[in-house]
Structures are given as C-alpha cells and as structure tokens.
Amino acid sequence: MLAVSLRDHGFPSATVQIRPAFCVQSDVVGSGNPPRMNYCQNARTAMSAALQSSDDAFRTVSSPLATDLDLSSPLEFFLRHRLTVVEELWEVVLRQECGQELVDILTQLRDLTSPEGQAPEVGGEALVQVIETLELSDAIRAARAFALYFQLINIVEQHYEQTQYQLAYERSRLEPLPGPDESPEGLHTIEIPQHQLDPFAAVIPLNQDPATFQTLFPRLRQLNVPPQMIQELTDRLDIRLVFTAHPTEIVRHTIRDKQRRIAYLLRQLDELETGKNRGFRELEAQNIRQQLTEEIRLWWRTDELHQFKPTVLDEVDYALHYFQEVLFEAIPLLYQRFRLALQGTFPDLQPPRYNFCQFGSWVGSDRDGNPSVTSAVTWQTACYQRSLVLDRYITAVEHLRNVLSLSMHWSEVLPELLSSLEQESMLFPETYEQLAVRYRQEPYRLKLSYILERLHNTRDRNTRLQQQQEKDPTTPLPEYRDGTLYQAGTAFLEDLKLIQHNLKQTGLSCYELEKLICQVEIFGFNLVHLDIRQESSRHSDAINEICEYLQILPQPYNELSEAERTAWLVQELKTRRPLVPARMPFSESTREIIETLRMVKQLQEEFGEAACQTYIISMSRELSDLLEVLLLAKEVGLYDPVTGKSSLQVIPLFETVEDLQNAPRVMTALFELPFYTQLNPTQSEPLQEVMLGYSDSNKDSGFLSSNWEIHKAQKALGTVARDHRVKLRIFHGRGGSVGRGGGPAYEAILAQPGRTTDGRIKITEQGEVLASKYALPELALYNLETITTAVIQSSLLGSGFDDIEPWNQIMEELAARSRRHYRALVYEQPDLVDFFNQVTPIEEISKLQISSRPARRKTGKRDLGSLRAIPWVFSWTQSRFLLPSWYGVGTALQEFLQERPEQNLNLLRYFYEKWPFFRMVISKVEMTLAKVDLQIAHHYVHELANPEDQERFERVFSQIAAEFQLTCHLVLTITNHGRLLDGDPELQRSVQLRNGTIVPLGFLQVALLKRLRQYRQQTETTGLMRSRYSKGELLRGALLTINGIAAGMRNTG
C-alpha cells in the first residue's frame, strides 16, 4: 500500500491508501480466439479496479481509493474533495425535499450494482424487484434525483477542467521560452524516406501536445519552421464553427442559468478554501455552502422538461444564449492570447486578423427534414440575431462614453475627428442641441453619442422589420435620413477606428475600444452567419414541377439521365430568361423552396451578403444537384448569368459511403465548367467549400469504414482542388457522439490529411455538446484555442503518413472488412429492425416533445433507411449498446491479424503509435467500449422484447456480445493497455465515476418503458386502460430517465 497525506494538499488530516492497480495480460494474438470473457468483464473489471464507485470514494476521505491516478497532484485531490462536497449537498437537498425514504431508495439502488459499477448479471433479481415494486411517483423522483446527480457532477468536472486549463496556461506563460537550438524533451526522429513526409514531419512530439498558443509557438521555433511559413498561414487562417440545434438537447434555459450560478459559487468556494488564512474565512465558506444548498433546492423544485414542444425560435434562443453569456466576451481574449504568444516567440510576425475565428448557425435556417423551418422563421432568426448583437454594441458604446472622458484642455484632437463631429451635428440636430454644451470640450464623448444615435436607429429599424414580418409584410417602414443609421457593421467599424486612430496619434490606447473593434470584426451586425440547408431531391422535384408547368422539356425532368439534366441546366444558366412566374401556381413544397431563396435575397439586401450566403445541399450525389440550386438562385437574382457573379455559395454535402467515393468525380466536373470558378468576385482565387457528413456514412457502413472513407475523400478532394487551382475548405459535419464523428476536436483535426487543412476548416458544434464546451468562459477559450492550435499544427506539421500507400491499402482492407460485418448485422440480419425497435427506446424518443425536428424523414416507411442518424445513435446509447461507434471493428482487426499474427500485430501497434489517423480511430473506439454495459443492455432485451421474440433476439444479442468481446480484446492488445482508457486517466475516472449511478437509472428506464408499452398495448387491443397511471405520467417518467442517462453519458446522439 502507498499512503499519501491529504494534509500536504490543503485538506483535513487524513490518509488515502492506494492499492496497486490490477492489470489484465492480453493473450498473444495468433491463436485466432480471444480469451473467454463475460462480455469483456475482464477488461471492464480491470478498469473498475482502478476506480471504485463514487459512493465508496466519497463517503469519507479516509476510505481507500483503488486508483493509480496521480494522487500526488493537488488538483486531483481538489477534484475528489469537491465531488465529495457536491454529493453531500445532493443528499442533504434530497433529504430536505423528499425525506430520508428517497435517500434510502437511491442508496439501495446504487448498492445493488456490482462493486465495479456494472449492472448485476441478469438473473440476479434483487435490483429488478426493487425497481418493479416502486410506485411511479418514487420512480420519477429517483430518476430526477439521479439526473440531478449527473448534472452536478458535470458542473464539477467542467469547473475542474477550467481550473486545469487556467493553471496550465499560467504555467506555460511563466516558463522561460527555449532557444531555437534547444531540443525539446520527448521528441523522436522517425526514420522514414523524406519524400514520403512533409518538410517538418521528421520530428514528432510524443508527449505534451502543444494545444495552447503558449506551447505551440515555441515548439514551432524548436522545429525550425520558417517564420515566413508561419506568417503566411497566420494571414490566411480561417476557422469557422457552426452551431446546430439538436433533437436530444432537452435542458431548459432556466436549468442552464442555475448550473451557471452553481459553477460561480463553486469558484468562490475554491478561492476561500485554497487561499491564505482559510481558518478566518470559514464563515464565508459556510455561507457559500448554504447558497449552494439553496440553489440546488430551487433546481429540484424546477421543471427540467419543457411543458410544450419547443419551436424553432426556442431553439434559436437556446443556441444564441452562449453568445450572450460567454462567447461575446471570450472571443477577444482568444485573439489577445494568440497575439501575445506569437509575438513572444516570433516578435517580427504580425498577428492574424481579428476575425480568424468566426461563427455560423444552422438553428432557424436548416430546413432539411424540418417543416417547421420556413422562410418567415429564418427571417425572424436573422432579425433576432441582429437585435442581440446591436444591444451588446449599444451597451459597450455607452460604457466607452463614460471611459473616454478626454478633454480638449488636456488632450489633442485631430482635425478629422472634429470634421466628423461637424458633419454629424447636421445629421443629428436634436442630439447636438442636447449635448453640444455638455460635451463641448469632450469630443470623444460627443462622437460616441452620435454613434449611439445611429445604433439606436439601426436597432429600431431592425425591430420594425421583425414586426413587419410577424404582422403585415406590406406595412411600409419609416424612412431614415442617409447617414443616420448603419447599413452594415463596416460603417460602425470605421467610426470606431477613427476614434482609435485619434487616440493612437496622441499617444493613448484603450483596451475596451480595442475589444469592441475585435467584436465588431468577428460578429458584425449579424452575430453569426446563417447557412441554409435543404435535401437535394427537394430541388429536383421543384424543377420537375416548374418544367411540367411550362412544358419546356420533351419528358419529365426527373426522368432525364444525369448527362441530359446537366446539359439542360448548364444551358439555362447561360440566360437571364426567367422560369418561375410571379404568382407561382405550384405545390407548397416548390413554393417553399423559391420563397426561401427570395428571403435569402431580401436578407442580403437588408443585412448584407454575409448574413446568409451559404446554401448546403444534403444528400448530394451528382453535379446536377448543385446546378439545380444555382438555377433556382438565378430565378431570384442571386446569380446573374450576364455578369457571371453569384452572391450565393452552393455547397455539396456528401453523406453516404457511395457519395463520398463519388465526391472527387462530382467536384472535378463542377470545376471544369467554364463559368463556375468565376462566380465569386470577392475572391482573388476561387474558394470552394465541401461538406462531409459523418452521421449517415456511419449509419450506412459503420464507424471504421465511415472514418476511412471521409479521410480518403478529403485527400482526393484536396488533389482535385489543387489541380484546378481552387482553394478548398472542408466542412466537417461532426456530431456530439463518436458514432456521428464526435470526440476531442484536437485529435480529430490532427488526424486530417495535413494538406487538406491548409489553415482553413469549418466544423459543426452540435446542440448536445454546446454546454460542455461553451458554458464557462475558460472552457470556451480552451476549446477555441485547441481547435486553432490543431489547425496550425495540421497545416504546418502534417505527418506524411497519410501518403504511405501500403498503409493506405491496409486501411482499405480493414474498412472493407468492417463494413461487411457491420452491414451483415444492421442491414442483412432480418431480426435487427425488430430488435432495435423493441429493445431500445426509439419509439418513445420519436414521440417525445424535445425537438422541432421529426426523428424520421418523410418517406412513408418506418425502416432504418428513413430513420435519421441522431435518433439511431441516441437509442443505442440510451440502452448502453453504443453499437454504431464500434461494431465491426473487432472482426476487421481479427481477420487482418490472422493472416500474419506477429508481424501484423506489430504493424498495428506501430500505426497506433505513429499514425494520427489510426490512433484517433482506436482511441475513439476504446472510449466508446468503456461506456458500453452489455449486462444492462441485455436487461433491455430481456424485459422489453415480446415473449414470442425472445429466442431470435437472444441470437442477435449474442452476435453483438461476441463482437464486443472481440473488439475489447483487440483494442487492449493494440494499445498495450491493461484496462480500457489506461492512456487517458482523467477520462477513465470520469467514466467510472458515472457507472454506478447510470446502472440503476437504466433499470428505472426499462421499468417505465415496460409500463408505458403495456399501457399502449392495452388501449390499442381493448380500448380500456387498466393502469393506475396516465400515459402522460409514464411518458414524463421515461423522459426524465432519458434526460438523466444523457447527462450521465455526457453525449447521446
């Protein structure tokens, strides 16, 4: 036993005893048979042996912790201590609100799980019996309590992550910078022929990834990267993050506000407990603990769930909440840290432009499969965004007017500022009359007053635009004199820079002014750029209907071959002749397509092109899919064939494996159209954005195949773009879960083919992960900084491994084998659809009031093809299978290893150590496997399957369990880990922390789903209801368990 004193780390006198970790020795690969495991319990038990359930760990600080984490770290002890405090507060609140009886029920439920935090083996009746006999009210309270527990744990972990980042940032800032000749520790020279590598890939850091600016730039200097290359990359750096709504994000604003207040109180408590003279501040600490208790009690008495189906505008409000609360203030700090770190290492280099990192949004503009998103809704969204950002600017300028109180008695003023004041006195005579005397010697205050008038007028016009759309679009808007409002953020920026220039010329600077200029550069007057998205067949159907009405084709458009469609579309794109009559005698679907494009044109005229200039075509398959949108854009004036200019960027979204494979051919055909690359007059060199979808390709072919096809598509698209001298920006449609491309963004970006990044990237930020990334300022900064540093690294230090053809051939074989095995289960196993519908909560999820978007596409079918990727992944996650994120990987690896056991194992281990792409894939699979619990998954099968289906469903489950066992074994073998997640102790701790509580919550979900389905069967067959509970009560209980498991897993769909 190893004893560590807590007193050394600022905690009460106590000792933690650390047991040596129990390790599993993987059998040598080559026999073809993995060791026998009970659903990989050896691996899971080994991981759990390192970390006992949170209950035992937190009861007393003197209890032994079976962990090999670095408990010599004060920060780790700090986390343990804080978790203890929060769990104690949780129990206190439940005891106060519900009595000791509920606390006893929760304790009993958690105690009935295995010591490793796993579900007990099916057949152990104790836990099931307790759950089944619970009254519905007790079951709902238990579900709420567990959900609250997870939310509190998430807050503590976010707080811990933020503290980690702050400490790491301060440490890196204070450490002396190494000289250019000093060799960094942990660098290893890889002997690979130089022609296979990028110029600086010979030196690869094996530890301390430079995920912050303070670490990155010294590392680049150590590697002798030419400053000119860094400057060129910095000048073109273009990072875009696009917020999306999410069907599984069901946490209310009200709850988010409470979470933020609790995080603030925890930060105050930290300052008191870790500062000096703690004994004298104990009373203050007790007061904060009392406030925490009150906040948690208020939270307990608040509805976690929406009482109505959220509208699209509700989702807009939710997404923009993060800009209001965090991002608007955080983004200038990102620029400041970049500038200071760059110039601290390379003092002669210039920082990037302020808006190197920008934001977009699909919320309120993504109409793919969501009939609730109309042209009117998108217009309202744009007006709302504009209103929010104008409010922030008005507040900032009012503050600046107080700060810039410089008097002409004591400070010089340049003639150009005085000249602008004279002109504005004529534009705003009333303001001049009111303020000229008051500010006669304070020109900056007078200038800022005129700026405020313009901002107020701009906001007033925006409000009237929004009201006009809501009430009567024909109502005329009030007229404003030229120059009395801002048409765009550029004019506002010119006024601010005039003040900045005057201050600079007189030897002054103002941080608040610099910050506001940075914010205006980034957010403009639109806050975020709106992307329109629509499914490709909607455009084909619209053009088909238009052509049928006009009788201009010898046969229906949809019956033409691809070559015939393309030829006709190209011909139509050469003329201004309109196709669409003003009155539009078409179906609602076709009218909506045209009205959307007309609304985009109106938005651009009113708010500028940047407000909305991207049109994404989902399920893009052929060249005609892109030309159809361009033709419809021509009809509303977004493209002019005579000038050859377009204000709309047409973006293909390739989603399925087949479409990813065809993407290079489609883009080649597009770039070879003479008129196409000349569409955007603002670009010195044409820029094309291409979006790659992770969700549908994963659902189509499995995790390994999807990731490899996307990787290949990026390389091929990069080659096509370079051959045609077109700049390429890849738009990664990543979800929150691994099964939809989720996972750490830093590792994912480093795993991209380096030459395809080239300083440009666009990534979706899914609604379900927004809170984990942007709820706290330092977390938001860290997320943005890691993305930025990863883009710089990937662009400058590409590994070159992606170009080693024999490795690519091996990955091609692994992907094909994985795809075959995955599709054999998902699409060829005849019982899988029934299995999925019965043993996961998919039907209940589809009916829940948690999103404005339907769970299925409108095909009239209820097969897997019509099911969207999000509920597909969500359902597997809730039932603890997490199947889309790992199934098929084990078989692919095993078949490869059986060919040459020892040699191929060594090769895969080398891949894992050196190849960022392969390491990323295996790491994501390992993380997912650690979250799987097939014991409780089997409970879903046992309890929710119809009796007549039990036998065939058991066969399906056995097939899944065998693949899980195999995948666990081979991942551990390749990584040389004794337990899952040995390479990431913090994630390992986080997963284990939750396991003991997710298990009873899963059992509660099964019991509630069982009652809900029995209720439905009774009413459908007899028309009578024999349950004591209403359908609404049962559905509410089920939703609470979904909410709790989602919080516990920290990602869902």
From Swiss-Prot:
Annotated catalysed reactions: oxaloacetate + phosphate = phosphoenolpyruvate + hydrogencarbonate
Keyword field: Carbon dioxide fixation, Lyase, Magnesium
One Pfam family per UniProt: PEPcase
Active-site residues, as the UniProt record annotates them: H246, K699
GO biological process, one term: oxaloacetate metabolic process
Coiled-coil regions listed in the entry: none
Gene Ontology MF: a single term: phosphoenolpyruvate carboxylase activity
InterPro entries in alphabetical order: PEP_COase, PEP_COase_bac/pln-type, PEP_COase_Lys_AS, PEPCASE_His_AS, Pyrv/PenolPyrv_kinase-like_dom
Group of enzyme by EC: lyase
Lyase in keyword set: yes
HAMAP family the record matches: PEPcase_type1
Protein family membership: Belongs to the PEPCase type 1 family.
Protein task: Forms oxaloacetate, a four-carbon dicarboxylic acid source for the tricarboxylic acid cycle.
Official protein name in the record: Phosphoenolpyruvate carboxylase
UniProt source species: Synechococcus sp. (strain ATCC 27144 / PCC 6301 / SAUG 1402/1) (Anacystis nidulans)
Organism taxonomic ancestry: Bacteria, Bacillati, Cyanobacteriota, Cyanophyceae, Synechococcales
Gene expressing this chain: ppc
